[in-house]
């Protein structure tokens, strides 16, 4: 989930509200480890959540049974208004009982300085998982500029930083409705232009098959836009580019660009989307719909391209569909070079989880965080990247984890699947943990099963096949997984995993960045959905002119320094791992 940037006024307000929150804050706070165990509602301020309100369903039952708590999710992404909710709660001195938010832009340091989050050190007796991943808390303390256990990052790991962290598939790569690709005759896809021709063939076939002219090859959404169109930034990763602010850096460090680079990766993809628009391949709802609406369309078979692994396959590929040879699969795009980030032992420190300073029953809250970093907690907080809980979804057989029939259903297509009453009842998808905060990397090794948390990589799953996978494998050099195909063709570009958070910006630069981001996002959408080349060129020119006028050179200098610092750290880690 991309964090939504805030407006210039709100950005300045953030600094002010954090400063006000710190007025009168003491350097130490009373420590009380006593807890009467009564049912409590825990307010979770969560910058990554896509749901707001009381946690429902099977995940709610697990938290209630284990800790006697109800989680009340407070989600800026749902509330809207950029960072207004963060600013309002910060100014009041109480973000929430548990806090999940970004460290970027100096926020971590400001939160600690303002006394809005608590040092968990006094509550760590018996908290073995927090101690196990102390590299993460220590790295966060450096970002905070003050010693203490202020929280942990997401996706912590015990695996090598030079090893691709994604497993069977990269996060960002082109997935297509393989059944319609088959009906088109498995055409070659040499480059992105040819890809559009293939998508046009597929769209024509799909519309005829479904008797619906509202089936589109491409459908987008705006929820995650920040420094640019998030959809485009994800597509840039198809070709080995990682995004940091306005900048893009190739995984091997050989190229750096920005959103304004003429004929750079960002503008090339915008041009590709524009061409798709003129070919009638783009859903006209793209500029107004949200993630949920897009997800529904994909689930119902109305979209033919998924630019990332966590959309098409888990939403559409049910067992019943795969048995008919129907579903999403990796496209054989010959020019793709998917970006891969190596495992990060310290975790991704762009976001963290910690305890709010005004929280009561802090010992219980620390126990919850400690548990979230345990194997049991990883499965319980699954949102599709790992198996769901043992007993509910899988069991150990002959020393190996094996999915149950229910586990297979929800792992591959969870829409509409009912949960057994003993696990809380309701629809599985409605009960998924709303935190959207993966604590341990899904492809790290569970010390209890000796396999990954991700069931796609379990031996019991890898040996399974179905008509969809068999047909895909037959036309992809016999590969059994996406990663096997990409690795065989030396397509994956790995950047060694290191924890990195961009340096703090001053308020003036933050305000400039907000203006630039708004201009870039607005012009990008207009360019992508333009109906003529002249209109596209006009929007790109206007985007460049506006961004330059707002001081883009300063932003570029800052972002280039950040990506080069990040790359230097990656190279150092890679060298040490040899």
Task: Give residue ranges: language-model regions.
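Conserved N-terminal structural module of periplasmic/extracytoplasmic solute-binding proteins
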Residues: 3-4, 8-11, 20-194, 243-248, ...
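Flexible loop/turn segments at secondary-structure boundaries
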Residues: 25-27, 49-53, 79-83, 105-109, ...
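Loop/turn elements at helix/coil->beta-strand transitions in domains of secreted/extracellular proteins
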Residues: 38-42, 67-71, 92-97, 116-118, ...
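Extracytoplasmic/periplasmic substrate-binding proteins
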Residues: 48-55, 67, 158-175, 182-186, ...
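Carboxylate/His-rich catalytic cores and anion/metal-binding grooves
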Residues: 116-145, 199-202, 213-250, 302-321
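Helix-loop-helix "hinge/cap" segment bordering the ligand-binding cleft or interdomain interface
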Residues: 121, 153-227, 251-293, 297, ...
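Structured mid-domain segments that build the active-site/substrate or prosthetic-cofactor binding neighborhood
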Residues: 302-414
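Conserved small-residue motifs centered on glycine
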Residues: 380-522
């Amino acid at each position: 989930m991309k964090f939504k940037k805030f407006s210039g006024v709100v950005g300045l307000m953030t600094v002010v509200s954090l400063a006000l929150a710190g007025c009168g804050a003491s350097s130490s706070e009373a420590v009380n480890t006593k807890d009467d165990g009564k049912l409590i509602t825990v307010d979770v301020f969560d910058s990554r959540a896509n749901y707001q309100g009381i946690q429902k369903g099977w995940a709610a039952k697990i938290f209630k049974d284990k800790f006697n708590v109800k989680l009340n999710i407070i989600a800026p992404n749902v509330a809207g208004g950029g960072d207004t909710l963060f600013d309002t709660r910060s100014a009041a001195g109480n973000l929430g009982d548990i806090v999940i938010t970004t460290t970027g832009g100096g926020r971590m340091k400001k939160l600690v300085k303002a006394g809005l989050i608590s040092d968990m050190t006094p509550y760590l007796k018996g908290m073995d998982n927090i101690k196990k991943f102390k590299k993460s808390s220590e790295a966060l303390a450096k970002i905070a500029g003050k010693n203490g256990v202020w929280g942990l990052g997401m996706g912590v790991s015990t695996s090598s930083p030079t090893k691709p962290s994604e497993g069977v598939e990269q996060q960002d790569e082109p997935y297509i409705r393989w059944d319609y690709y088959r009906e088109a005759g498995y055409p070659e896809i040499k480059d992105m232009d040819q890809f559009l021709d293939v998508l046009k063939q597929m769209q024509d076939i799909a519309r005829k098959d479904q008797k619906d002219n509202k089936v589109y090859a491409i459908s987008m959404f705006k929820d995650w836009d920040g420094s640019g169109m998030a959809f485009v930034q994800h597509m840039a990763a198809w070709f080995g580019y990682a995004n940091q602010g306005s900048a893009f850096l190739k995984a091997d460090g050989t190229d750096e660009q920005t959103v304004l680079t003429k004929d750079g990766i960002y503008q090339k993809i915008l041009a590709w989307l524009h061409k798709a628009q003129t070919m009638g391949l783009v859903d006209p709802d793209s500029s107004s719909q949200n993630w949920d609406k897009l997800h529904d369309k994909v689930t119902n078979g109305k979209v033919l391209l998924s630019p990332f692994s966590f959309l098409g396959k888990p939403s559409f590929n049910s067992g019943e569909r795969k048995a008919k040879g129907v579903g999403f699969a990796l496209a054989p795009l010959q020019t793709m070079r998917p970006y891969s980030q190596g495992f990060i032992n310290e975790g991704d420190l762009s976001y963290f989880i910690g305890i709010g300073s005004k929280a009561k029953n802090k010992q219980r809250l620390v126990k919850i965080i400690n548990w979230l970093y345990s194997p049991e907690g990883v499965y319980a907080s699954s949102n599709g990247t790992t198996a769901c809980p043992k007993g509910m979804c899988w069991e150990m057989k002959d020393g190996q984890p094996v999915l149950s029939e229910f586990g297979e259903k929800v792992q591959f297509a969870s829409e509409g699947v009912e949960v057994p009453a003993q696990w809380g009842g309701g629809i599985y998808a409605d009960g998924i943990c709303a935190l959207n905060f993966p604590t341990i990397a899904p492809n790290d090794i569970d010390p209890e099963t000796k396999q990954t948390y991700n069931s796609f990589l379990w031996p019991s799953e890898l040996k399974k096949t179905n008509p969809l996978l068999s047909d895909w494998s037959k036309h992809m050099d016999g590969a059994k997984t996406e990663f096997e195909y990409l690795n065989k063709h030396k397509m994956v570009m790995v950047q060694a995993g290191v924890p990195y958070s961009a340096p703090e910006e001053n308020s003036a630069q933050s305000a400039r960045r907000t203006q630039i981001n708004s201009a870039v996002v607005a012009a990008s959408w207009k360019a992508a959905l333009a109906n003529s080349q002249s209109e596209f060129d006009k929007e790109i020119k206007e985007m460049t002119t506006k961004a330059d006028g707002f001081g883009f050179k300063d932003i570029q200098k800052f972002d280039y320094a950040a990506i080069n610092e990040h790359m230097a750290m990656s190279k150092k880690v890679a060298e040490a791992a040899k």
